[in-house]
């Protein structure tokens, strides 16, 4: 049985979770909650990104009034101490787990983890995979015997992640085994890996990044 999840603070940045909610491995989205200042209350979740109605109405209820198992905290411009931590504390007090869908600072992580630990609930921070690249430099290109598909764009906000999920769904429905690396930290919620952190590192050459990626790609 899938775990009931609330998305907070719901905004266009985490719209992929709603648009592709049927692909989530272990979660069922039961509510999207936004602060009053977002101006989204009472509107369909699709209003945030201009899509077709989803049937999920954005709420400004206290999360304690909703039946759920996990609080999915998505990236936003909202102040962490003013908006995010009060909801984390409330979720913990209700005995619910907290999952951050983006990387937060060490201080923020410590505060959230300590808050959850006091109430014996989990606090998980999903991030890009960190790896020791020094162990990967065998400098031998591994031959690939399967097709490789890249999804890329020259600008932001082109729904790349939705395209990645759409391709995944199509190929799996066609009977293919799909090994995938995605561009969002929360790829694991959909059953595949987030892009490794070293791909964003300046200290590695583009050639070295390719070699490392080949050795860390899931089979």
Tell me the role of every PLM-derived stretch:
Residues 175-188:
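Short beta-strand-centered segment that lines the nucleotide-binding/catalytic pocket of NTP-utilizing
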Residues 121-133:
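N-terminal pre-Walker A segment at the start of P-loop NTPase domains
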Residues 186-205:
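P-loop NTPase switch/communication element
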Residues 211:
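Flexible loop/N-cap segments at domain edges
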Residues 137-174:
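Walker A (P-loop) phosphate-binding motif
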Residues 1-120:
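Long, basic/Gly/Ser/Thr-rich N-terminal segments
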Residues 215-219:
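Conserved small/polar residues in nucleotide/adenosyl-binding loops
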